């Protein structure tokens, strides 16, 4: 196993992942054990496995709440969108997901371009 002190983790062998529950595309529900399920928790678990660690989830209602917890030693990694203000206190890696979104209008709407 990797020396835990090399990574500055609080709990030996455990990766604490900050998870934003506010995006249903990335967190889709809960497992039978009550852990969050979806893309973000799966990626956090895969990262932990890659290092030989277990994972624990620290859940927050919004990405802002995850970011605000950065100084509270509540998580070791978090999975939120990059933002210039957040980058002042959080170091971001490349994107792990891209979400394509669009605007919808009712049939017959005069709005054709936004």
Question: Residues of each region from the PLM?
Answer:
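A generic local structural motif
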Residues: 2-4, 89-91, 108, 112
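Extracytoplasmic small-molecule ligand-binding "clamshell" domains
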Residues: 1-81, 86
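Residues embedded in well-ordered beta-strands
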Residues: 16, 102-104
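Flexible hinge/capping segments at coil-to-helix
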Residues: 96, 105-114
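Ligand-binding "clamshell"
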Residues: 85-99
């Amino acid at each position: 196993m990797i020396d835990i002190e090399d990574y500055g983790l609080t709990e030996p062998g455990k990766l604490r992942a900050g998870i934003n529950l506010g995006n249903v595309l990335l967190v889709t529900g809960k497992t039978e054990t009550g852990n969050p399920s979806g893309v973000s928790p799966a990626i956090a678990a895969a990262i932990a496995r890659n290092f030989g660690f277990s994972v624990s989830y620290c859940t927050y209602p919004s990405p802002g709440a995850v970011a605000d917890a950065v100084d509270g030693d509540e998580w070791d990694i978090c999975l939120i969108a990059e933002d210039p203000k957040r980058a002042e206190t959080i170091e971001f890696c490349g994107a792990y997901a891209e979400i394509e979104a669009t605007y919808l209008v009712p049939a017959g709407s005069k709005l054709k371009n936004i």
